Amino acid sequence: MIDSQLRTSGVTEPFVLARMGSVAREDFVPEGARTIAYIDRAVPLGGGKFLAAPLVHGKMLAEARPALDDTTLIVESGSGYLAELLRPLVGKLDTIGADEVAGGKKGRKSYSLILVDGAIEHLPDALSNRLEENGRIVTGLVLRGVTRLATGRKVAGSVTLQPLAEIGIPVLHAFDRPKEWSF
């Protein structure tokens, strides 16, 4: 995984390679999926949950640039793998399910870093309001049906996401835009 998926795709940050080399992906999938835990695409976990491809997590960590003074929120896809990768790299780590964010679940008021372990169609206020001023967010973003890795920063109370690269990130349907009729 380190040599054939991460390094060949430009993920070379030592802290990313060290963490991904030390956390066994097979511990985060059902017994029947252990043999495909390192495949270069998402592993379905059932019930709409998934373990994203190694490259997705590697690029997310690299773009997040976590620090020990970060208070961090991970919006989970259901595997717990991203949280385990990040835990020793940040000061405080909370996790929440995508459905809980969409439902407006209360929690810590602000975070310096938010990672969304999946792709979203839009960034809801329920999530952007949890990002402190000058805080960072790393997420998958669905644009015209294509998923991309995106980053953002909260400036003057507003978060703008900047797409970085097309990458196969499973969609978190709790963040789908309401369907509207149009010509």
What do these predicted regions represent?
Residues 74, 115-116, 139:
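Redox-cofactor binding/interface segments in oxidoreductases and associated redox assembly factors
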Residues 135-153:
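ADP-ribose/adenylate-binding Rossmann-like module
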